[in-house]
Amino acid sequence: MIERIWSGRNALYLLLLPFSLFYGLISNFTRLSYRWGWRKAWRAPVPVVVVGNLTAGGNGKTPVVIWLVQALQQRGLRVGVVSRGYGGKAEYYPLVLGPKTTTDEAGDEPVLIYQRTGATVAVAPVRAQAVKAVLRSAAVDIIITDDGLQHYALARDIEIVVIDGERRFGNGWWLPAGPMRERAARLQSVTAIVTNGGKALPGEMAMRLTPGLAVNLKTGERRPVTELDNIVAMAGIGHPPRFFNTLRQLGVTPLRQVAFADHQHYSAESLYSLTSSGQTLLMTEKDAVKASAFAADNWWYLPVDASLPTAEAEALLATITATSAG
């Protein structure tokens, strides 16, 4: 229903417009209060790169963060990552992730980024506190903030916006009548625009999510996803249809598709009940970090990696590296 409202195909969005106008007023006031110096942003002693979006819902931001961290690490930079930690509830903040940190504490995306990159990752509701925690924990050359484009209390040097190329900006209205956190005109002031799927417009970098081999949650075994039998597919991400569409593009037709809310907590019982004897449960990597502690033998996940045009990616990385060197 919400997708239809946000796309403009359902007239119910008209009833929500008064709330959207209020949201837009607050959003604009917040941004301008920092721009005009009425409120002061905290600036870290190292460059800060924000990877965020203008819309609510899954746009493929986390794969971009992972790609960026790994690419900068390959260039010899020591990278720290900060996040709000959505879906997690730690006993204290800021929380610096370690090998035993759970998704219940830190949230699924920070744990996934930590596991994939090995970078120093910290979470806190106030991102400046997370940055300070990273700086106390490790020597870093640059900070990547996962989301937080609208968190203007943290000064930034580079802004990267990730767009869903299929859904774009829906009906263009602010939340809750539409999907927008900020209006599309905000793109005029960012460093780079990465478009996930669909058709990239001039000035945008076309990104594709490239699937890897399916991985068994319990054993770590890897095999082509087409070799798995009797698949029940599940996804608890911002936009589950993207995962299901990926499977279809790979030639996989699941027996059933189960969509969960983004950042939803799982229990062993709720996931064990999804399959019966002889069936395979296939999930996203983001789901896997939440389910690995109680995984069954027939549970697999499909990792994806962000792929960007080489020349444009190199130009962006050069800009970021130069900022770090300066």
From Swiss-Prot:
Keywords: ATP-binding, Kinase, Lipid A biosynthesis, Lipid biosynthesis, Lipid metabolism, Nucleotide-binding, Transferase
Native source species: Erwinia tasmaniensis (strain DSM 17950 / CFBP 7177 / CIP 109463 / NCPPB 4357 / Et1/99)
Described function: Transfers the gamma-phosphate of ATP to the 4'-position of a tetraacyldisaccharide 1-phosphate intermediate (termed DS-1-P) to form tetraacyldisaccharide 1,4'-bis-phosphate (lipid IVA).
One GO cellular component, as annotated: plasma membrane
Assigned EC number: 2.7.1.130
A GO biological process held by the record: lipopolysaccharide core region biosynthetic process
Pathway in which the depicted protein is active: Glycolipid biosynthesis; lipid IV(A) biosynthesis; lipid IV(A) from (3R)-3-hydroxytetradecanoyl-[acyl-carrier-protein] and UDP-N-acetyl-alpha-D-glucosamine: step 6/6
Superkingdom of this protein's organism: Bacteria
Sequence positions that bind ATP: 55-62
Family named by the database record: Belongs to the LpxK family.
UniProt-listed HAMAP family: LpxK
Annotated InterPro entries: LpxK (IPR003758), P-loop_NTPase (IPR027417)
Name of the featured protein: Tetraacyldisaccharide 4'-kinase
